[in-house]
């Protein structure tokens, strides 16, 4: 079963989110993070963000979690407020 790493952030400005989105589109993703998909959600009025990373195996999740947990604060969207691991029993696209 796939796993998801769901991270919440505060203090995420619209400008910071635009900068991160541009970096991700240009291929500037964290190395050694074997995520199969990344979803970034942003509430610009509340300056909050949620980042969801999907992993296919427990080993991939562990590797990604180690790298992302060690990431400098300047490389994250804002102040990290929570990190939660979820099983992904259903994942659908149209």
Language-model regions, residue ranges each:
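Short S/T/G/P-rich N-terminal loop/turn motif that feeds into the first structured element of a domain
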Residues: 1-50, 56-70, 76-94
